[in-house]
Swiss-Prot record:
The keyword rRNA-binding applies. The keyword Oxidoreductase does not apply. GO terms for molecular function: rRNA binding; structural constituent of ribosome. PROSITE patterns: RIBOSOMAL_S8. Part of the 30S ribosomal subunit. Contacts proteins S5 and S12. It holds the Pfam family Ribosomal_S8. PANTHER family: 40S RIBOSOMAL PROTEIN S15A. The gene is rpsH. Keywords: Ribonucleoprotein, Ribosomal protein, RNA-binding, rRNA-binding. One of its GO terms (biological process) is translation. This is Small ribosomal subunit protein uS8. It comes from Marinobacter nauticus (strain ATCC 700491 / DSM 11845 / VT8).
Length: 130
């Protein structure tokens, strides 16, 4: 049986690994997952990530903790396969009053809500991170 929502699986694996205080988490890789991992790294939510060069590439994300607590308090999928959420540049949500980020897939690539607003582009709201 094939997986329907691979990004939701990615976020669940990250949540579960952090609750178990794991140093890193491994999952099957895809271009979208690597793009999301890059945004999470750029925003300081994860320490690092790497992609293996196997026949079936795997994405390994090194999680980040501060004072023994996970840096990511909450990561939630917004747009899902059965209900896509598209927003214009002016309609992009501010997460936790601007303290968190929304990750958006735009025509210019995957970026944060702040970067999308600054570029004046909207897109599919993939998830929110706080």
């Amino acid at each position: 049986m094939s997986m329907q929502d691979t990004l939701a699986d990615m976020f669940t694996r990250i949540r579960n690994a952090q609750m178990a205080s794991k140093a890193d988490v491994t999952m099957p890789s895809s271009k979208m997952k690597v793009s999301v991992a890059q945004v999470l790294k750029d925003e300081g939510y994860v320490a690092d990530f790497s992609v293996s060069a196997d026949a079936k590439p795997e994405l390994t994300i090194t999680l980040k903790y501060f004072g023994g607590k996970p840096v990511i308090e909450e990561i939630q999928r917004v747009s899902r396969p059965s209900l896509r959420q598209y927003k214009g540049a002016g309609e992009l949500p501010k997460v936790a009053g601007g303290l968190g980020v929304a990750i958006v897939s735009t025509s210019r690539g995957v970026m944060t809500d702040r970067a999308a607003r600054a570029a004046g582009v909207g897109g599919e709201v993939i998830c929110t991170v706080f």
